UniProtKB/Swiss-Prot annotation:
Protein name, entry field: Lipopolysaccharide core heptose(II)-phosphate phosphatase
Pathway membership: Bacterial outer membrane biogenesis; lipopolysaccharide metabolism
Pfam family of the protein (one): His_Phos_1
Task performed by this protein: Catalyzes the dephosphorylation of heptose(II) of the outer membrane lipopolysaccharide core.
Domain of life: Bacteria
HAMAP family documented for this protein: Ais
Main location class: periplasm
Family (UniProt): Belongs to the phosphoglycerate mutase family. Ais subfamily.
Matching SUPFAM superfamilies: Phosphoglycerate mutase-like (SSF53254)
Gene Ontology BP term (one): lipopolysaccharide metabolic process
Amino acid sequence: MLAFCRSSLKSKKYFIILLALAAIAGLGTHAAWSSNGLPRIDNKTLARLAQQHPVVVLFRHAERCDRSTNQCLSDKTGITVKGTQDARELGNAFSADIPDFDLYSSNTVRTIQSATWFSAGKKLTVDKRLLQCGNEIYSAIKDLQSKAPDKNIVIFTHNHCLTYIAKNKRDATFKPDYLDGLVMHVEKGKVYLDGEFVNH
């Protein structure tokens, strides 16, 4: 009986250790949380989410020409050549897991150029509402999603929009770099923030 109890205790101890290791392993991959408190959602996790419901991914535009010493693509209010390369690389990785999506951008040169290089030929719809970064952006997202309820959506917008959404939805301080993104979805007329997109 004593031997059985010892064996049982050892089994429980090993089980707890395994659970802890599994949790640590998970935190090293797609299950990790960012230091800002947002869940980190990588490409594979995003693809799994998209199988459950259509996702809305909002990206900050690529590197601005007027705030960089790198070569401009063309217009000074647009993005740099490096920005185009970064956007194309991100788009290729994203499309490998989420090939089917509708593409939108705000009506600025830098977001339009970023979306164009990201998509590699996909039709782009420019919507000036995506420049508005208060509660209005939720109305715009819901409207876009209602036009094609079963489609994933990619939106190119601005850092202050992403910062506002993270704070408003999860009380998180999010200071996005170029091409950083947030993952959202619409359910029963409400917009939910799932986490921060991490390109892996």
